[in-house]
Amino acid sequence: MLRVSDDWERALHAPASAVARPGGDVIVIRSGSSYDGKQGMSLATGVSSRSAGARALCLHVVTIPPGSRGVPHVHEGHESAIYTVSGETEVWHGEGLMQRTVVRAGDFMYVPPGIPHLPVNRSDVMTVAVVARTDPQEQESVVTLSLPPHLAELDDFPVASP
């Protein structure tokens, strides 16, 4: 059974810094700072072209507060892999966001390039997930979409990070 301590929250809000190792072969990003992504969620600064000089990927932690949601979006030309550390998220996905999948702590999810998706946290627990994407610029490929009419009830859910 995976156990998660509350240390992740403290680390998420500490100042981020990159630490170069002697010899220059690896870079450690001390997590801490975060930013509001176009997709409407708070992302902890992680590995990217900006923080580590990454050329083909980014890796960060996303949080979705209880009773909130992201913004419908796609990542044009980039794959995403997501591991849910804690919480439970309803993900609407596919053309017109017509498909619904529930992702729980311990689940992995793969999102192919260009697939629309929208995370919703209907629970009373913070969702924390680790996200890897083949976009080293992090936000470069994010294209936001409108909420489709069949999901209009989600207008009542605040966007996690407006």
Functional labels for PLM-detected ranges:
Residues 1-56, 71, 144-162:
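A short, N-terminal "cap"/entry segment at the start of jelly-roll beta-barrel domains
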Residues 45, 60-76:
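Conserved short histidine dyad/triad with adjacent acidic residue
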Residues 52, 77, 96, 124-125:
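Short strand-connecting beta-turns/loops that link adjacent beta-strands
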Residues 59-62, 81, 110, 124-143:
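A short hydrophobic beta-strand segment most commonly corresponding to one strand
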Residues 61, 74, 93-95, 121, ...:
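Residue-level recognition of conserved beta-strand positions in structured domain cores
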Residues 64-67, 103-123, 132-134:
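Conserved metal-binding segment of the jelly-roll/cupin
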Residues 69, 78-105:
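A short beta-strand-loop-beta hairpin characteristic of the jelly-roll/cupin
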Residues 88-90, 116, 126:
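Structural motif
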